[in-house]
């Protein structure tokens, strides 16, 4: 057994030039082979027909300020544990990406000893690999569309495309206008920026809302331990605050918050505290 400290150098991703996975130190500190599934007991599950629309990221690489690429995607715990709770609560999922290309995961964070979570991933593997194209969903949305909620999981991958997607913006506006729930965790709330008005003077539909999310200050610290190979080129918290959103937490903690029908969590460890409302 080695007594040497684990390296804080980001690990090369040989599939792409100048791309990196988190350091061994970061993986040891911030991932776990098992997740906490406490509270996933729903004695009266939903029995209706409405589903959950999960919008995943189809982006693998996020460019850093120093020109390196962070090999990212959706965080598996932030995706699959909320899915597990919702599944236990009686809901099924439609899975979509902006392009219709496969959902990208940060597999280095998969809780590989957690059979309930790896089993759920396997059960939805075909849907993750062959997701719906979001534009096709947008074209069919209406007041009677069969979705109870929109779920946008975290991981750094959503920063690469979702905040700039017209289709994501259209889905979120539909949810707000039709009294449906929006659920998001950690970096997932960056996707709320897709609702940014394109016309001067037009209001931001989420102005006045409060959320919890991964703090910008924490993202600024991650290169110090090699979690990311450089600093982000922008910070979603700053942009949301400028649009009138209040971010309640300043630390990476277990905090969650429900504001009207927007339900958010601050970090990968928030999922067990994410009190899922009746969203039918």
Predicted regions, residues:
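C-terminal substrate-binding/catalytic lobe of Rossmann-fold NAD(P)-dependent oxidoreductases
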Residues: 218, 227-263
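Glycine/threonine-rich flexible loop motifs
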Residues: 157-167
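Short, conserved loop/helix-junction motifs that constitute active-site signature segments
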Residues: 175-177, 202-207
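Helix-enriched interaction subdomains in cytosolic or periplasmic regions
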Residues: 2-30
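Conserved small/polar residues in nucleotide/adenosyl-binding loops
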Residues: 272-278
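Short, hinge-like loop/turn segments at secondary-structure boundaries
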Residues: 111-114, 200-203, 229-230
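Catalytic nucleophile loop
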Residues: 149-154, 168-196
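N-terminal beta1-alpha1 cap of cysteine-dependent amidohydrolase-like domains
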Residues: 38, 42-136, 140, 144
């Amino acid at each position: 057994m080695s007594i040497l400290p684990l390296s804080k150098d980001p690990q090369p991703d040989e599939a792409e030039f100048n791309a990196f996975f988190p350091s061994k130190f970061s993986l040891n500190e911030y991932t776990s082979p098992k997740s906490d599934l406490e509270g996933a007991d729903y004695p009266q599950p939903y029995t209706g027909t409405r589903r959950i629309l999960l919008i995943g990221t189809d982006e693998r690489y996020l460019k850093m300020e120093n020109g390196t690429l962070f090999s990212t995607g959706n965080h598996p715990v932030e995706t699959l544990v909320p899915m597990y709770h919702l599944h236990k609560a009686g809901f099924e999922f439609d899975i979509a990406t902006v392009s219709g290309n496969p959902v990208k995961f940060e597999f280095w964070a998969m809780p590989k000893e957690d059979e309930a979570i790896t089993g759920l991933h396997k059960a939805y593997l075909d849907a993750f690999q062959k997701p719906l194209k979001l534009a096709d969903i947008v074209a069919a949305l209406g007041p009677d569309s069969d979705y109870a909620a929109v779920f946008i999981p975290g991981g750094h991958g959503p920063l690469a495309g979702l905040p700039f997607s017209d289709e994501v913006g259209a889905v979120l506006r539909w949810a707000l206008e039709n009294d449906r729930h929006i659920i998001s965790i950690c970096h997932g709330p960056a996707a709320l920026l897709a609702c940014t008005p394109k016309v001067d003077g037009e209001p931001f539909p989420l102005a006045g809302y409060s959320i919890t999310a991964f703090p910008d200050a924490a993202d600024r610290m991650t290169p110090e331990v090699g979690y990311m190979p450089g600093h982000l080129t922008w910070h979603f918290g700053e942009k949301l605050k400028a649009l009138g959103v209040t971010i309640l937490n300043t630390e990476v903690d277990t905090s969650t918050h429900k504001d009207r029908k927007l339900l958010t969590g601050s970090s990968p460890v928030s999922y067990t505290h994410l009190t899922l409302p009746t969203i039918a």
